[in-house]
Amino acid sequence: MSRNDSISRNDLHGEISRHDRPDRRRVLVAGSALVGASVIPGVAGAAEAGLASAAELTVRTRAFLAGLDQDKRKTASFEWDGKEWRGWNYFGFPSVTKPGLRLEQMDAAQKDLGWALLATVMSPEGLKKARNVMTLQDVLMELGDGVGQRSPERFSFAVYGTPSDTGVWGFRLEGHHLHQSIAMRDGQIVSVSPSSFSCNPNRVTSGRHAGLVTLQAEEALARRLIGDLGPRLQGRARLSNTPIDNILSYAGRERANGRKVGLPASELSSAQSDLLWQLIEIYAVDHLSSPLASAQKARLRTGDREAVHFAWYGPNTPERAFGYRVIGDGFVIELGSVDPAAQHLHTIYHDLSNVLGRQA
């Protein structure tokens, strides 16, 4: 187990350990607006309408639960909005597993039901990225990290509340460097965040999976954008020469980091603005199935597009640590480099209008 993956058992429900908690200097670098930033202009009421019908997801979630025996169903089921739902995270270390029923605990038919459930809300690209994150558990073991303890199937499926056309309930896929929370209200999908596809290593250079790159677009588009800015705009966008080494918007602080810092989109050229929105949609749209993706794209654009801010941290040098944040009227995106070579990356996307099914 690597130092950067270590957290204590008390961290399971959202408390961040000394290896994952951003220190005070990092918080100040990211912007001095962590306090009092929960009310974001343009967010309140933005998620009153659902994103898409939850009918198929409800049917497939019921089918998944029906395919489990009583003990497995109990393992996969939790109350709505309890400590497990609120205590999301994407951390992972071999000795402790996530709440829910793990793939490694399912038989082949149950796995098929689980993947069919995921396919109702995730695009083929999203499913591939999730599988890539899972595959990296094998890569870590090949590198001698967690041998005999990690598994590409140590990822949990969990249902929160009762799948129904009325009321509120949720579904979650969670494991090391992977987190997807979906919340439903009265037959509608209302929230698709937090969403995290993280990785270690991002670029696999040896072994059976050599050539695999998990967060290629997340890195390439952001580096291209900061590199395309002239010196003056780069100076506005770069808030620190020191990269951020982790996300700041962790469990319980999802809305605490929404103050806009960095370079506003109003100062970008048309081509640069297009790059920025490609980057945003990589995090918030492209991993989702249609028509959910179309509805999510429309929600993102309900705010002021010109007021979206892009903030960069660290150098823009290949294979060197970097970080960035993108903040809009109703969302925040973060990427941090845990290691100096930009191989261990943590990312997050939050819909600030509807965090875990709770409206702003």
Give the ranges of each region predicted by the language model:
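A cross-kingdom marker for long, charged
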Residues: A49-Q70, T75-S123, L127-L215, E219-A360
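Generic secretory/membrane-interface signal
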Residues: N4-D5, G14-S17, G42-A44, A63, ...
